Structure formats: structure tokens, C-alpha cells
Amino acid sequence: PQEEALSYLDAISSHCDYKKDSKDIVEAAASEYCEKQRKVKAGFDFPSFCYAMATGIGKTRLMGASIYYLYKTKGYKHFFILAPGNTIYEKLRKESNPNHPKYIFKGLEAEMGKPKVYDGENYDTYPIKYDQMSLIVEKTSDIQLFIFNIGKIFNSKTDTQFNFHKFKETLGASFADVLAQFDDLVICMDEAHRYYAPASMKAINYLKPVLGLEFTATPKSTSNVIYAYDLARGAVEGYLK
């Protein structure tokens, strides 16, 4: 199923340029080349595609494969990975370490090198500089992953903004402003149905990614699903017990 899922991203990506094309053009390509031709429409300000995959099929592996694909075919190097809570956040942090047995890019090390990982604990060490008060983000040859836990950085009861939208003295800017500088930022949302509250969507839209990839077994809406693989099919085909 992961290979099949990736084939739809490939078909869509081959017919549009996420950096240059408008959201409407990208969604028109997605509507034509998704699994079951349908009108694809994302709720965010940017094009965002959902993989509706049953739990246990390997969404994290698919995320790693999608990142590799966009790096290899489009040259994108900046990937923002959002986790819905501490358990998944810690799991993603561990699995982004090449020494972990379930390394997210297992088997792709020779092609990808070692991606630099920034997360909720070390993001204020990100290297930036200023030129006449303008924020300059250094060009990088490495893939950079930014792994954040929405529960940790955003508290809807007390906070109207993500913590990384706040000014950081060490950076001289907010980390959201740093992320918004990248012209190739892709946002990967694990358990994507958790991010559709208005405040979360506003904070995510602020980052201006070129593309969103959503991974969930229970999509908030089916309007942007490009590939679906449910429990029943997984059981029949032997991927789930």
C-alpha cells in the first residue's frame, strides 16, 4: 500500500510545480491523478493531500518515503513534521535517528545523507544571520527536518499562538518567521485530523508551506484524500491481522 500511495503523489507531482503553481492548479492536477478521480480541495491556504491509511499500515514509513521522493524529484530540503501529542512526537524524534531500528529513512541513507533534525528542544540553535535587519536563512545541502508536538507548542486554552510564533532572543526572530523564509517547506501532519481547529489552521497557514501531506486513519474531511487504504482491505490483503 505504501508504494501504491506514493505512486499517486508521483502522478500528481509530475503534473505541477508546487513552488510556482497556484493552489487551484495543483488541486486540479490532484483531482485528475488521485486514486479515484474526485475534486480535491484542501482546507488550508496551501495545497494539502491526505493519505487515509488504516493504523498499522506504516504511515511513518510512508512519510519518510514521501520526504525522500520530494527531495529526490523536486530538490526540496525543508520538512516540518507535526505530531499530535507527546507519545507520537517522541516516537518520531527517535525514528529520525539513523541508529534506530525503525529509522524513518531506512535503506535510503546512501541517497539522503544524514538529515539535520531540529525539534521542540533544540530549535533555538538554528543557524541564521541578519543583513541590514533582514533575516537570512543559510542555504543548505542537507535535508532539514523540524519535528514539533502540537500539544507542547500550542495550548488552545491559554495561548492564541504557537510558542514558536513568539520572538526568540537567540534567533532574533520567531521560529515561525524562520520557517516561513523557506521556499520549499513541506509540512507533514501525523494524525492530521487533529489540526483542523481554526487556531491551529491559522498558525499552520502562517508558515506558508508549498505543500502539506496529511497522514491519518480518520480524515476530518475526505475532500483532499488522494489515496485511501482501510482496515477491511488491510485484513483481506494480509497487511493487518
Language-model features: locations:
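RecA-like P-loop NTPase motor core of helicase/translocase proteins
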Residues: 1-241
